[in-house]
Amino acid sequence: DGSHLSFEDNIKLTKQVVEYAHAHGVTVEGELGQLAGVEDEVNVEHHSYTNPDDVVEFVTKTGCDSLAIAIGTSHGAFKFKPGQNPQLRFDILEEVSRRLPNFPIVLHGASSVIPEYVKIINENGGSLKDAIGIPEEMLRQAAASAVCKINIDSDLRLAFTAGIRETFVKNPGEFDPRKYLG
């Protein structure tokens, strides 16, 4: 992921990855624009939207197979502040799709942060105050466009954590992972 680099350095890095990966039969997802939030214990406080003027040059010069764009999503379970109205920049998505017709577009940081999982976690000893994600209707709108993949890692982590916390509260003496992970 070279999205934190300058445009030129992102192209250079992504092209190197593409050349190596394609030689080994592996596809590559490039990324333009930077998402805020926490990913892999790295905290990025500021985001930058994908500039549609850059996408054709980036895809052409790198040879990437799909492109992750930044339209207002962010990593982690705390994407928005309470009372904040989540807004995704569908105008950017539409313009990118117009400039790259039939090219696979990806959204990173698009977990909906399912309230039921947050509730289970909090009811079973967790503390996820004000965890807010992307509204499902916005994800459905994105999926109906050129978006072919929506990354929802935080939702998977929340579901797993909710299940584990609930299991341990109901079965406090359990210590055999085969019984609670199997």
Task: Tell what function each PLM region has.
Residues D1-P104, P115-I132, E136, R140, ...:
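Alpha/beta enzyme core
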Residues E123, I134-G182:
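C-terminal alpha-helical cap/extension of soluble enzyme domains
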